[in-house]
Every structure is written in structure tokens, then in C-alpha cells.
């Protein structure tokens, strides 16, 4: 059986990255998948080669208007739209259609949190698309509605989750994520001009103001039986893509007790917890020794590179993760979820190998 795929918001960074990955997917290469409607509200009628010249195999195609009736003709629909747009379209699509939403509309389970951070009506929540979180892989495989996580929550969640689950830290977590400019999307703004970003790094929406903060807390709360406190600070850096996250938290009483007996054993325990937690995960690479994650190493891949350290003097666990914000942070996660929901190998069309330099 051949399945048809549509991408709404195809001309944005996330949408075009989904298309790039679909073009190398084994199902597409074997003729078992077709790429149908490519839609974009502001680019309808324009050619793919004019807007996305890098997608050579789609040259000759034209961007269509985003219309639910057209999307409903497909078996799988990726929604790569700004928040507030996906919910309206999703309610018009058939129940049997696999809908994978790359926006924020269905990520938060708490209505009050949604209303506090977003300026559109609450639409409910769907199964959440980080397969590496305990229990989520099964939920993703048994649904036709999937909420792809935000890019910052992906890097932060995967960095902190093992430490919380293994009770290595107290749930008072400081997270700083350095991101490339593609995370802001294609919409022009003064702050994203080259002259504003080149040679400069700056924090923004600090102090709990960023919309991904409640999503990070929601994810980490699943692994903790007491309230999780998160201070999240995003930092814009002069690079095109990638997110480097550093999370730190006070050591738990158990880890402190071990430290007082044998500091070296405490450090080993932290690293061992991460290796054990991710031992069966294809896309999570826990680095050896003192090697640290770098955004360049994951460029173009669906991999997450992680290093966990224990600062004995400060009694803090410090974890760093690196992802490509457009792959594991968005499009790759969407493809990974599609594979699970369709019963295909989870890594189909996805690489753990980055591009360097």
C-alpha cells in the first residue's frame, strides 16, 4: 500500500527540512510513499525551485494554499505552522489521518499554562513526541495525533531526565540553551538581521518568560514525585542552526553522601546513570571521558550528544546536550514519530551522523 504525505507550511525552515528528510526516506525511495500537497499561506502559486532550490527532486512543483479539504486527501499530514493555526486545521481532518503537528498547539496538558504563555485558545493535548521519554514510544505508536516537542524542551529534557529519574539531583534546575538564528523561523525581523546577530550573542526572554518553559517543566515533572523548579534562559548565538544546552542542579542527599565517602565513585555514578538510561536509544550518544557536545557534531543529524559531569566542589550535576534544532529539534523528531506510528523502523530516513566542518 502506498501512503501519501502532505506538508502544510512547507516553505518554512521546519517544513522544508521535513521534505528534505522525506526525500531520503526508504519508503519514498521504494515508491511506497508519495509526497503530495505542499502548502504555504504566503507563497501559494510560487515554485519550489524559487523558494527551496536545495530540494532539487521537488523542482517543478508549486506551493498550494493551505486548505483542509486538500490536506484531507492524504494519509499523513505534517503541520509546520505557527502556533494557533494547527488546531483549526486538525479538527477538519479525518480521524484516520496521521497528523503530526510541529507547532505548539497540542503540547501542553495544562490549560492554564497554555493561556499564560500563548495568545490563542487552548485546543487540548496530544501524545507527546519524544520517544526517548519513558512510556512515550508506546503512546506514539498507537495514535494518529502527535505533538512534536519544541526544540528547547527536547535538548533540555534529554539532558536532565536521567539525573531526575536516578535521583541524582534535587529538582531545582538551571538551564541555559544557546541557539542558532533558524530557531526564530523565516519571518523577517530587525533582531534577526545579519548586522544584529553576527559577532554577538544575547539572552532573551529570561526569567521564566520563554514559552518553552512550561513544556520543559511538564516533561521533567513526569520523572519526579515533587514539584520541579526550572529557571530557563535562551541565548541567541551567531550560527545558523543548533542548540547547545547546559543544565545544572544541586546534588541529591544520596549523591552528596556518596561524595563524602568517595568523590570519584560519585562522579562515576553520574556518568553510569546516563549510559544506563540511554543504552538502548539509537539517537542519544552519551560521550566518553571528558569530551563535550558541540553543535557542529550533530549538524544535519537526528542525534543528541550528551555529557554528564559532577562538580564535586560545588555539589552540582552539570549536563550538556547538543542537537540540531531543525532535525532532532523539529523535523527529525516528526519523522521519527511518523515511523513509530506507521510501524516502520524508528530510524528510517534519519541519520545519527552529523556534517563537519
UniProtKB/Swiss-Prot annotation:
SMART domains xrefs: Semialdhyde_dh
Class of the enzyme per the UniProt entry, highest EC level: oxidoreductase
Listed GO CC annotations: cytoplasm
Main localization (coarse): cytoplasm
Keyword annotations from UniProtKB, A to Z: Amino-acid biosynthesis, Arginine biosynthesis, Cytoplasm, NADP, Oxidoreductase
EC annotation from Swiss-Prot or TrEMBL: 1.2.1.38
Highest taxon of source: Bacteria
InterPro entries cross-referenced by the UniProt entry: AGPR_AS, AGPR_type-1, NAD(P)-bd_dom_sf, NAGSA_dehydrogenase, Semialdehyde_DH_NAD-bd
UniProt pathway: Amino-acid biosynthesis; L-arginine biosynthesis; N(2)-acetyl-L-ornithine from L-glutamate: step 3/4
Residue numbers annotated as active site: 151
GO molecular function, one term: N-acetyl-gamma-glutamyl-phosphate reductase activity
PANTHER family per record: N-ACETYL-GAMMA-GLUTAMYL-PHOSPHATE REDUCTASE, CHLOROPLASTIC-RELATED (PTHR32338:SF10), N-ACETYL-GAMMA-GLUTAMYL-PHOSPHATE REDUCTASE, CHLOROPLASTIC-RELATED-RELATED (PTHR32338)
Function recorded in the entry: Catalyzes the NADPH-dependent reduction of N-acetyl-5-glutamyl phosphate to yield N-acetyl-L-glutamate 5-semialdehyde.
Entry similarity comment: Belongs to the NAGSA dehydrogenase family. Type 1 subfamily.
The name this protein goes by in its record: N-acetyl-gamma-glutamyl-phosphate reductase
Species name: Corynebacterium kroppenstedtii (strain DSM 44385 / JCM 11950 / CIP 105744 / CCUG 35717)
Amino acid at each position: 500500500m502506498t501512503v501519501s504525505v502532505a506538508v502544510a507550511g512547507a516553505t518554512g525552515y521546519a517544513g522544508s527540512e521535513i521534505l528534505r528528510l522525506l526525500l531520503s526516506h526508504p519508503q519514498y525511495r521504494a515508491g511506497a510513499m508519495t509526497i503530495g500537497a505542499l502548502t504555504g499561506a504566503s507563497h501559494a502559486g510560487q515554485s519550489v525551485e524559487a523558494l527551496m532550490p536545495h530540494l532539487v527532486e521537488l523542482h517543478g512543483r508549486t506551493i498550494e494554499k493551505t486548505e483542509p479539504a486538500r490536506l484531507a486527501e492524504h494519509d499523513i499530514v505534517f503541520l509546520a505552522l505557527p502556533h494557533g493555526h494547527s488546531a483549526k486545521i486538525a479538527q477538519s481532518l479525518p480521524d484516520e489521518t496521521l497528523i503530526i503537528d510541529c507547532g505548539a498547539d497540542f503540547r501542553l496538558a495544562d490549560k492554564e499554562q497554555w493561556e499564560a504563555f500563548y495568545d490563542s485558545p487552548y485546543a487540548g493535548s496530544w501524545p507527546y513526541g519524544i520517544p526517548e521519554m519513558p512510556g512515550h514510544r508506546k503512546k506514539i505508536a498507537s495514535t494518529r495525533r502527535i505533538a512534536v516537542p519544541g526544540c528547547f524542551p527536547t535538548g533540555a529534557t534529554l539532558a536532565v531526565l536521567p539525573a531526575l529519574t536516578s535521583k541524582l539531583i534535587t529538582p531545582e534546575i538551571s538551564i541555559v540553551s544557546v541557539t542558532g538564528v533558524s530557531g526564530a523561523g523565516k519571518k523577517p525581523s530587525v533582531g534577526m538581521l545579519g548586522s544584529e546577530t553576527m559577532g554577538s550573542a544575547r539572552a532573551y526572554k529570561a526569567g521564566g518568560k520563554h514559552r518553552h518553559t512550561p513544556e520543559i517543566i511538564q516533561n521533567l515533572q513526569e520523572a519526579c514525585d515533587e514539584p520541579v523548579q526550572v529557571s530557563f534562559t535562551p541565548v541567541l548565538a551567531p550560527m545558523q542552526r543548533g542548540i547547545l544546552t547546559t543544565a545544572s542542579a544541586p546534588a541529591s542527599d544520596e549523591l552528596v553522601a556518596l561524595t563524602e565517602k568517595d568523590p570519584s565513585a560519585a562522579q562515576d555514578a553520574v556518568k553510569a546513570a546516563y549510559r544506563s538510561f540511554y543504552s538502548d536509544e539509537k539517537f542519544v550518544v552519551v560521550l566518553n571521558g571528558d569530551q563535550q557536545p558541540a553543535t557542529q557534531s550533530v549538524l544535519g543529524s537526528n542525534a543528541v550528544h550528551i555529557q554528564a559531569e559532577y562538580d564535586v566542589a560545588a555539589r552540582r550535576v552539570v549536563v550538556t546536550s547538543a542537537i540540531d534544532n531543525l532535525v532532532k529539534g523539529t523535523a527529525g523528531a516528526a519523522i521519527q514519530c511518523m515511523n513509530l506510528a506507521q510501524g516502520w523502523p524508528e530510524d528510517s530516513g534519519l541519520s545519527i551522523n552529523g556534517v563537519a566542518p
